[in-house]
């Protein structure tokens, strides 16, 4: 059985890293539409703790997760975990 690693997305919130499809910046219009569509369909998880959204994470289950941590920071955490697991 493969060990599942958790990706810290800030404020005590974690995502299983193998389920992450993409980590993107929320400032573009398509990302705003993605967020609104997910909210309307009940697929949105807000992990910002009331702070400004700085990254959007999309999972293989088509859930959209909002994080207050920069996309670059989460990306570095994601890649460093992958290197550790190899």
From Swiss-Prot:
This is Putative regulatory protein Desal_2819. It comes from Maridesulfovibrio salexigens (strain ATCC 14822 / DSM 2638 / NCIMB 8403 / VKM B-1763) (Desulfovibrio salexigens). HAMAP family: RemA. InterPro entries: RemA-like. Belongs to the RemA family.
């Amino acid at each position: 059985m493969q060990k599942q690693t958790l990706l810290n997305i800030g404020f005590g919130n974690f995502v299983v890293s193998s389920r992450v499809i993409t980590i993107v910046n929320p400032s573009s219009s398509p990302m705003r539409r993605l967020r609104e569509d997910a909210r309307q369909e009940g697929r949105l998880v807000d992990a910002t703790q009331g702070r400004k959204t700085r990254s959007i994470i999309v999972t293989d289950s088509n859930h959209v997760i909002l994080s207050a941590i920069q996309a670059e920071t989460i990306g570095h955490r994601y890649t460093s975990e992958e290197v550790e697991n190899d």
